Amino acid sequence: MNRLGAERRPFLFVIDYKQEQVIVEEPDQIDSEALLYNLDGVTNVATASRMNDRENRTSAIRWETFPITQSAYADSFHKVVGHIRAGNSYLVNLTCATPVRTDLSLKDVFVSSEARYKLWMKDRFVVFSPEIFVK
């Protein structure tokens, strides 16, 4: 990343939260069969394939979520507030795992999402967000 940045060459990086798995690739080296991204319009997804995948669906989407309890969220929220008040942080993104049951594939979720920032990695995960985390 340092070398590419110093050379002012664009790159995509993906790092898991445990910092155990890292991907750093230049856009022209990314295999779109294995990884798709759309970062506020900077994308390797062809417009025609996006629309065709979405329009080919004939049945309703099955989508069921299993969020944490309000009490569990409140506990996490109060912990974050305590750290902010203690001066340990001034910016926090409080998130929690929410299991989802659906008949969509991970790629279907990517294609269906209208988020400004999204990424799909074949057979691994999909992620999407309305906001950028690193700029």
Task: Locate predicted features.
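Extended alpha-helical targeting/anchoring segments
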Residues: 1-135
